[in-house]
Design a protein with these regions (language model features):
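N-terminal glycine-rich FAD/FM-binding segment characteristic of electron-transfer flavoproteins
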Residues: 1-132
Length: 132
């Protein structure tokens, strides 16, 4: 659920998912994490092409260019078209099983692992620290 008036282009935190998320339903943990961080959810073109999310959520050259304080890229390969839309982000955390993925090599921070385990663990730790 987005904070009123906050858009993909203006949010200080964006949690995006790519093909690695696997399905529309599998975006639920990303939605939860974005909510805990008062951010919004974005996605890659592969996700909109698969019909998992609306084009309005797409980050990239043919979507929205973003410049959040924190960009968390989950299961995104980091094709140049996506990178063009995300590269102005101040801090990028890539979560991916592929240590050689473009987004991983360009991100300031990376967790090499399964987003389906990592994202819920991050959310659980945030809830623990903030009693949410």
């Amino acid at each position: 659920e987005r904070v009123a008036g906050v858009t993909l282009a203006t949010s200080p935190v964006v949690v995006s998912g790519g093909r690695g998320v696997g399905s529309a339903e599998a975006f639920a943990p990303l939605e939860e994490l974005a909510g805990l961080l008062n951010g919004v959810v974005g996605c890659s073109r592969a996700v909109t092409n698969n019909g998992w999310r609306n084009h309005t959520d797409q980050v990239g050259q043919t979507g929205t260019r973003i410049a959040p304080d924190v960009y968390i890229a989950c299961g995104i390969s980091g094709a140049i078209q996506h990178w063009v839309g995300a590269m102005a982000s101040k801090n990028i955390l890539a979560i991916n099983t592929d240590a050689q993925a473009n987004i991983v090599t360009k991100a300031g921070y990376a967790v090499i692992g399964d987003l389906h385990a990592v994202v819920p663990a991050i959310s659980a730790e945030i809830r623990r620290r903030h009693n949410k």
